[in-house]
Amino acid sequence: TKRGQKDQPLKVDYNGYFGMDYIPKGVYDVMDADQYSQYIGQACANSNTPLPSGYKLNSETGKYHFQDDTNTNWFDEVFKTGIRQNHNVNLSGGGAHNTYNIALDYFNQKGTLEGAGPNYERYTARVNNSMDTKFIKFQTSLVYSHSDQDNMGLSNASEYVQGLYGDVTNILRGTLLMQPTIKAYDSSTWVLDNLVGIANNFNYDAYGYGVYYDTIHGDISASNPLLVNNLLQRNTRVDRFVGTGSADVDIFNMFGFNSKNHKLNYKINLSYSKTFCKDFTWIPAWVQSNRVYLSKSNERLTKGSRIYSDALIENVLTYDGTIGKHHINVVAGQSYEEENTDLLTGWGINFTEPYFLQLQNAANTYSESYEYKHAILSYIGRINYNYDDRYLLSATVRRDGSSRLTRSIRWGTFPSVSVGWRFDKENFFPFNPDVVNMFKVRASYGELGNENIGEYMYQAVMSRNNMTYNFNGNVVTGSAVSTFVDNNLAWEKKKTYNVGIDLALFRNRLEFTAEWYKNTSEDLL
């Protein structure tokens, strides 16, 4: 919202910062491999149970140790030093009849987690201008931003993986619970056949990521944070534009009359945004102890793209005028809003060459797509009138059309009206104004429309899911309408009646309101 000053030469300002984000270990003092091996050995000795595979007792030292001297510091593997920076350049100035302000901003943050993020980058540009003449004043404001974000998939993707793996834990829990005797990643454990458990001794998945399931302490399990953060990847790019423009016209002054009591204003609002999401979910084989989460033949790769866009345009013309004790405000407006969604998802199962993670490498491939459009067009007119702040009247009418409703009846008209009377403004007001300083009686009636349903619900949809018919003993697959639809979907209307009294006593120290209202709804969706 910053603007330049008139008669100001070009002024350039810069501010910025650079910083680092660090996740301290703090109170999380976990055991190293030697300490953990000794702990496991003593626990097994005390409970008279055999040592897990890989742990041995050194008869000379009397201490337990792990066979390959692995000593993984999971905090060091999972967390890294993040970097953030922000830079802003501002240019402003103005002449005798105009001002301008231009702001350029850059923000970048590299996250503290290894793997898919989160990382965030944003560019923003803002331009504000104003220009005034003797009769007209113009103002414009434009904002454009572009952002790019890498992070793990959304919760639904996590739940999907959890359904296959059984135990997908959050990052911190996995960092605390993973054994120091398991490597974060070991490419030598790659397995290209179905003998996953035999080849990696249950400690790694088929592609080298360490996994953990503990039978000694009961059913305790943890997910390798690097595994999870690389399984679920999402990139989101957003482009957004917002623009406003306005013109204030001094009508009487334009025609030579020296009056400030009549103003005409036009305002336009524009906005557009587009979001592109790219998803990647890879589910490799994982056999852990007696748990078989996924066999090699069921490894799954899912790739998806999602494009969302929305656009808005609003035009508003306002007249505001005063003649004596009469004050009139008239508004005429139009708005159009459109939303578009385009989803495309493909997945493949059974990968013979898993290091080539493309869908065409799968033995079986599947895909689905979905797109929809929602649009609403509105016209509005409103008039507010008051006489001496004593008699008040407001009347509004809207006409809205929605793409969600049946084509022939998708338009609806919604009127509203309200009246008010300031009894305390009358000469015959019987109460002491120092005691009752405001006494208002009001009544109103209004209608609102609701079209909050799904898209294309007024259209029958053909489905091929298990649609078969027997022709002379031969089962034939076909398509059929699978659901019933309402071909007469129209606006749901909510009607409101209201009567009220407002009182203010003792110079507004005490206020009182009494109301009666009635709400009814028609043509429920």
Q: Language-model segments: which ranges?
A:
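Residues embedded in well-ordered regular secondary structure
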Residues: 4-116, 184, 191, 195-214, ...
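A surface-exposed, glycine/aromatic-enriched loop/edge motif typical of exported proteins
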Residues: 22-55, 145-214, 439-468, 509
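Intrinsic-disorder/low-complexity loop/linker signature
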Residues: 26, 60-63, 70, 165-166, ...
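Short Gly/aromatic-enriched secondary-structure transition segments
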Residues: 27-31, 283-285, 346-349
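Transmembrane beta-barrel wall of Gram-negative outer-membrane proteins
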Residues: 75-152, 170, 178-182, 240-241, ...
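Extracellular/periplasmic, surface-exposed regions of secreted and cell-surface proteins
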Residues: 85, 128-137, 141-146, 196-281, ...
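A short glycine/small-residue-enriched secondary-structure motif
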Residues: 104-106, 284-295
